[in-house]
Amino acid sequence: MTRLFLVRHCVPAGRDAAAPLTPAGQLQAIALADYLETLGVELLVSSPYARAQQSIAPLARRLGLPVEIDPRLAERVLSAAPLEHWREAIRRTFEDLDLVRPGGESSRTAMARGRAAIDALRARSVRGVAVVTHGNLMTLVLRSFDTRFGFQAWERLSNPDVYCLEAEAERVRVSRTWGA
């Protein structure tokens, strides 16, 4: 059985790809390492964004493991232009999975991208995997396994957050393990 820990990054100093963790986010990354260290993680995979890589760095150092970077785990781009009412725009993309704004990515496309990354990891012979990504993409990946995940689930995510996907053959059980 594969246990895949889907991790939302710790608190960042901004939203762009290069934004680092805040000092509070750095402390959260240490707490995240304390938690994940006990779960039999053998493989670390991260979004290319700095905040995701910095969130898993303390665990990588402790376990002496490299962090694989997978661009499919990057956050979903909602729009090329900043949106004044971005929260409402995200809500609408959970209602209409094919809605796409100029320069953006639909929920359906982002979900397929994230799910492809997860399926590739599930196909590997590893018992425990920590995968660090971002809130919107994480919720869409969770939705690909359980359609009850939507806008409200996205709103309830914390920084960091951890969901466990326990896979055996084609069956996957989803459970929140961080703060649960």
Model segments located where?
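Generic beta-sheet signal
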Residues: 4, 125-136
